């Protein structure tokens, strides 16, 4: 039952049309790690601690959670994380590609806010189409359908965003998307 509930919530988070950012400060264990892996980007503070203690607790860990872990890190690291159940620090998490960056406590919130603003300032249709492509690519290879992404891409080229982006580029100014 737990895997069904968390699996559904994870699919909702991972499938949202808006890019998601995990800001990790402190412990990121078990379900917290699973949630962070559903996000598009993950940033942590130096004192963050990561782990997947399912093996230490006798908990069965779901197929989708392991698949997401394998998408992000190598099979060797995924096995180490799962089989040992040990805790690891921010540097190890970065080495395993579980986080994009490690930022000082005093800078992490501003950095995440700045990145979120940069994303929000970009062409909404392009961001949406990119997100849909990433969602499609995250599916099992047999379930992927590149044709499902074509309308999103075509919509970009026939949009006001595209016209504004080209115009801004030629005028050497920042585009103002709606």
Name what the model sees in each region.
Residues 9-15, 23, 29-83, 96, ...:
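CoA-thioester-processing core
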Residues 81-85, 130-133, 169:
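Short alpha-helical scaffolding segments that buttress acidic/His motifs in well-ordered protein cores
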Residues 3, 7, 30, 87, ...:
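Glycine-rich phosphate-binding loop at the start of an alpha helix
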Residues 6, 66, 75-78, 126-130, ...:
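A general structural signal for well-ordered alpha-helical segments in protein cores
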Residues 43-48, 99-147, 154-158, 176-178:
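C-terminal long alpha-helix characteristic of the crotonase
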Residues 41, 80, 84-86, 92, ...:
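Well-ordered beta-strand positions
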